[in-house]
Amino acid sequence: MEKIFKVTSDSGIHARPATLLVNTASKFGSDINLEYNGKNVNLKSIMGVMSLGIQQNAEIKITANGDDAAQALAAIEETMKNEGLGE
């Protein structure tokens, strides 16, 4: 399963929001990846997410594969919206 988000936060995905996304993803057993600008990283890795330097207005793709993939994507979408990170 996959979902594309547009980053709306003025400061993009910096340390605090990256930590929130990693913590959300880490609650699930599925393999969850984030793709940005041709690079694909494990969404459960803070260093991987931070290495992408995701800016405002960027499009990111999050993919989840596993038994709880749908729940994982729903939780990540909720975190993105609740924290004003993206839509």
Swiss-Prot record:
The activity regulation comment is: Phosphorylation on Ser-45 inhibits the phosphoryl transfer from enzyme I to HPr.
* GO terms for cellular component: cytoplasm
Q: Which UniProt keyword terms apply here?
A: Cytoplasm, Phosphoprotein, Phosphotransferase system, Sugar transport, Transcription, Transcription regulation, Transport
Alphabetical list of CDD domains matching this protein: PTS-HPr_like
The listed locations are: Cytoplasm
The family annotation for this protein states: Belongs to the HPr family.
Name the UniProt record assigns to this protein = Phosphocarrier protein HPr
**Gene source species:** Bacillus thuringiensis subsp. israelensis
Q: What is the lineage of its organism?
A: Bacteria, Bacillati, Bacillota, Bacilli, Bacillales
Instruction: State the gene name recorded for this protein.
Output: ptsH
